[in-house]
Every structure is written in structure tokens, then in C-alpha cells.
């Protein structure tokens, strides 16, 4: 375990936060935005790379073997654990998800517990609570029913955190959008950029999304709140959108009309199946709506309205 940059001097009274996953989609954004809010960041890296801009210091170490993390967590006030295997990395065996998303998280949490870290923020997923679609509105009170290896690994990590003495919080993130996004959201951006009218005006299923900036607000809020948390919290933009509304917002950002038309859903499914695309788009036919009311009770105020955020995304 070795530092690649000197420790920040203790003269600053601002919180020192250890961040994992700083090279990922969400981690990079947190690394850029949290220092603007006064946080000092210590980035935990698995291998020696260029020191990311915006961090107070960096430490090299393997999160799957955190027995020697005492130095890395020295003087740390809080941890944001963003590292892990993403849902977009399909085709991996369940053992890989369990190793990197569950076991590494719990071992790291135990190291944080020994280091007397005050708060452990785990970036979980709404998929820890349900499959790609769900009946009704998801709340933290509903029994979790993940349907794939990714979701099961995230839920198991949450359960492992609950067995520690840490003041932890698991942020169950809805589908996140922002610069550099991959996976399903990248597919929707590609659809919106296509020059063709789209036969999705009749799809009424609604989908909860989450702007990166609203996620930063949530992380800031749970780092600052004084009362113990020790629970999962759903993080989603307040108003879900239909697929048509998502595409319309993106095309508005491109300065174009929505260009959507109606095709009966069974016919649309048949056409996608014939083209070999039905599996990739099947989740779009069902709703996944998540309620962030519990987080709002902690005075979380999302800054980005979803339609405006989607319009801005495609302009970048």
C-alpha cells in the first residue's frame, strides 16, 4: 500500500472523503463536483495511474483484500463506495458479481469500521429492489426482489453493511443519465439522434431516471445529514417519463420535433422480435417507477428537471 500523493494537511477542517470507483462514469463526476462543495477527496485506486484531478491524495490498494487499508483510511471522515461491476457488463458469471460487488464491499466496510469512519455511502442500484420492470411504485418499504446477478449482488452488499456497526446508507440509484453514459441510456440517445420517426407514441409505461447532478445533490445530502441513517434510500428524479417523453425531450434538445407515431404494442413487439431486438428493448414495455420521498424528507432538493436534463445531455 503506497501513497502516490502526499496526505492533505490536517489544517483544513473540511471533511475528508475516500472515494472508490473514481475512474467510472459516476465516480468521475463525483470527483469533479464534490470538491466544489468543499470536500477533500482521497481517491482509492486499484493500480498506479495518473492522479485524477481534484483529489487531495490517492492510495493504491486492492479493495478485495482490504486487510491493509488502515493507512488508506487514516483520518477519513466518510467513504463513498462507487467501485464495482456495472449492470452494463452483461455476460459475466454470478460469482464475479458476488466477488466484486458483494464481498469486496463488505470487506471494505469492515476496514472502514476498524478505521472509525463516520459514514459509509454505498452506491447501490434500484435493481437491488426489483427487476427491469415492476408493478406499482417502488419504495424502500417494499420487499426487495432482484431478478439478476447484478441486482442480487447489490442487495447482498446492502445486507452485509447492515451487519456492521457503521453508519451506512445505500443509495438505490434509478437509471442515471449524464455525459459519457453507456448502456440503455446510450441506446435511447442513439434512437433520439436517428433521423427517423419512431413508432412509440402508444407506449404508456413510465421510467424513473436520475440526473448526475441530482445524484451529486443526494450524495452531498447524506454526507452532511447529522442523524444516523443505516438504511437504503431510493434516488430518482421526482417525475417518471414515458419512452416517448424521453425521446421527445432529447429531440427538443437537438432542435427537432418529436416525430413519434402510434403502433399497437403487440405489433411493435412482433416487429422487434423479427428484427432480433426484442430482448434489448423488452424493459421499455414495462414500467419501473421509484419514489424518492424518503430522501426528500432529508431535505434533498434535485436541481435538474428531467426533460431539461435530457435536452441538455444530447447537446453536449
Language model features by range: what are they?
Residues 99, 132-177, 181, 198-201:
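Catalytic helix-loop patch of NAD(P)-dependent Rossmann-fold dehydrogenases
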Residues 106-149:
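Conserved Rossmann-fold NAD(P)-dependent oxidoreductase catalytic core, especially the SDR/UDP-sugar
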Residues 17-37:
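N-terminal Rossmann NAD(P)H-binding glycine-rich loop of SDR-like oxidoreductase domains
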Residues 60-103, 107, 111, 128-129:
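NAD(P)H-binding glycine-rich loop region in Rossmannoid oxidoreductase-like domains
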Amino acid at each position: 500500500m503506497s501513497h502516490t500523493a502526499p496526505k492533505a494537511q490536517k489544517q483544513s477542517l473540511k471533511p475528508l472523503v475516500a472515494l472508490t470507483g473514481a475512474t467510472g462514469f459516476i465516480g468521475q463526476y463525483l470527483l469533479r463536483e464534490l470538491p466544489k462543495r468543499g470536500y477533500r477527496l482521497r481517491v482509492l485506486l486499484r493500480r498506479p495511474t495518473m492522479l485524477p484531478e481534484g483529489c487531495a491524495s490517492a492510495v493504491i490498494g486492492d479493495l478485495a483484500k482490504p486487510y491493509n487499508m488502515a493507512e488508506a483510511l487514516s483520518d477519513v471522515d466518510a467513504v463513498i463506495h462507487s467501485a464495482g461491476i456495472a449492470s452494463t457488463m452483461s455476460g459475466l458469471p454470478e460469482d464475479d458479481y458476488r466477488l466484486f460487488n458483494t464481498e469486496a464491499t463488505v470487506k471494505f466496510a469492515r476496514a472502514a469500521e476498524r478505521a472509525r469512519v463516520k459514514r459509509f455511502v454505498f452506491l447501490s442500484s434500484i435493481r437491488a429492489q426489483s427487476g427491469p420492470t415492476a408493478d406499482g411504485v417502488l419504495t424502500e418499504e417494499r420487499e426487495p426482489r432482484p431478478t439478476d446477478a447484478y441486482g442480487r449482488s447489490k442487495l447482498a452488499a446492502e445486507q452485509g453493511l447492515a451487519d456492521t456497526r457503521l453508519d451506512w446508507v445505500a443509495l438505490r440509484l434509478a437509471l442515471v443519465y449524464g455525459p459519457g453514459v453507456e448502456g440503455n441510456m446510450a441506446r435511447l440517445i442513439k434512437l433520439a439522434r436517428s433521423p427517423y420517426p419512431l413508432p412509440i407514441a402508444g407506449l404508456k409505461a413510465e421510467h424513473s431516471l436520475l440526473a448526475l447532478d441530482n445524484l451529486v445533490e443526494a450524495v452531498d445530502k447524506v454526507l452532511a445529514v447529522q442523524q444516523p441513517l443505516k438504511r437504503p434510500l431510493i434516488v430518482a428524479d421526482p417525475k417518471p417519463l414515458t419512452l416517448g417523453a424521453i425521446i421527445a425531450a432529447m429531440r427538443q434538445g437537438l432542435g427537432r420535433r418529436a416525430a413519434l407515431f402510434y403502433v399497437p404494442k403487440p405489433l411493435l413487439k412482433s416487429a422487434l422480435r423479427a428484427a432480433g431486438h426484442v430482448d434489448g428493448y423488452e424493459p421499455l414495455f414495462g414500467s419501473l417507477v421509484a419514489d424518492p420521498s424518503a430522501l426528500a424528507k432529508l431535505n434533498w432538493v434535485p436541481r435538474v428537471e428531467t426533460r431539461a436534463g435530457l435536452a441538455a445531455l444530447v447537446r453536449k
